[in-house]
């Protein structure tokens, strides 16, 4: 079984979703990949460009570090290990970045660590993959 955990920069309460992903990995022997989509960074960068404002590059790094810290904290609590499977960071619209990432990789399940919304439902519909939204 191949599982993808999707984290976003807009939703910090990801412990339950990470717990599900860890359980799939440990109890079912699932291969686990983690994708962190920095959609808020993308939107902020677009707004700055639109208004001709400079975009501080440290915002991208700070967002990555914030997700990484939270993931490491929860991962260590659940597994006792600080070794996390590779996390891929993407900056862009959630729908586009997830779709590009899953293409041709054979995922059977996507675990979403984000708040359910009409937008997320559209993203999920476009993937045609089993999905579990954990809020």
Curated annotation (Swiss-Prot):
Pfam families to which the protein is assigned, alphabetical: Usp
Domain of life per record: Bacteria
Signal peptide range: none
Xref: Gene3D superfamilies: HUPs
InterPro entries noted in UniProt: Rossmann-like_a/b/a_fold, UspA
Entry similarity comment: Belongs to the universal stress protein A family.
Name used for this protein in its record: Universal stress protein Aq_178
Organism: Aquifex aeolicus (strain VF5)
């Amino acid at each position: 079984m191949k599982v993808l955990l999707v984290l976003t920069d807009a939703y910090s309460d990801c412990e339950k979703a990470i717990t599900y992903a860890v359980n799939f990995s440990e109890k079912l022997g699932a291969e686990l990949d983690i994708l962190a989509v920095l959609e808020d960074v993308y939107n902020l960068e677009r707004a700055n460009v639109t208004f001709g404002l400079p975009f501080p590059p440290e915002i991208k790094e700070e967002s990555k570090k914030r997700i990484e810290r939270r993931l490491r904290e929860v991962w260590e609590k659940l597994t006792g290990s600080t070794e996390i499977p590779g996390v891929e960071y993407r900056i862009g619209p959630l729908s586009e970045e997830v779709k590009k990432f899953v293409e041709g990789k054979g995922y059977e399940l996507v675990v979403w660590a984000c708040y359910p919304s009409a937008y997320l439902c559209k993203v999920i519909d476009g993937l045609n993959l089993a999905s579990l939204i954990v809020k």
